Design a protein with these regions (language model features):
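Catalytic tyrosine of NAD(P)H-dependent dehydrogenase/reductases that use a Tyr as the general acid/base
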Residues: 4, 41, 49
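Non-catalytic terminal and boundary segments that flank Rossmann-like NAD(P)-dependent oxidoreductase
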Residues: 138-151
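Active-site-adjacent segment of SDR/Rossmann-fold oxidoreductases
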Residues: 13, 33, 54-64
Length: 151
């Protein structure tokens, strides 16, 4: 796993020099919210988000901070390659959700400066999916522990 190799290589040096440092791991929104037909890809992205969360906790009292980038749809050449594989309606939806790569760069820079952990690039579509996932998890907890419900 590339990010783990990079961390193993550079983290000791970052800690040793003592200056403020920051690690940004690039995951995907698929590492936060599962999508259809992405079991292998999504699992690797979930693992990267989890590793980043643990790393952030491990480094909380050091000079190194951590972020995880979770873009959903970015307007890159990947989208143009989808044309042959998806319907026109799906492609239209993807294009409507796509954010400009410079927006992603701006979000990453802002997160580094503000030491923000989760970096999202779209506050509309991803917010809806994230809310649905969190609501489903909380609903399951409420069903399993009804006597402990907190309104």
């Amino acid at each position: 796993m590339g990010p783990l190799n990079g961390i193993n290589l550079f983290l000791p040096q970052m800690l040793e020099h003592g200056e403020a440092s920051h690690i940004v791991n690039t995951s995907s929104f698929s590492g936060i919210h599962g999508h259809g037909n992405q079991s292998a890809y999504g699992s690797s992205k979930f693992a990267l988000v989890g590793m980043s969360e643990f790393l952030r906790n491990d480094l909380k009292d050091t000079n190194v901070s951590v972020s995880v980038l979770c873009p959903h749809v970015v307007d890159t050449n990947i989208i143009s390659k989808l044309k042959a594989r998806v319907s026109a309606d799906v492609l239209k939806m993807i294009n409507q959700m796509a954010v400009d790569p410079s927006t992603v760069g701006d979000q990453v820079l802002k997160a580094i400066i503000e030491k923000e952990f989760y970096i999202f690039c779209d506050g509309v579509h991803t917010r809806e999916m994230l809310k649905a996932r969190c609501d489903a998890m909380l609903s399951a907890m409420d069903r399993q522990f009804p006597e402990e419900e907190n309104d």
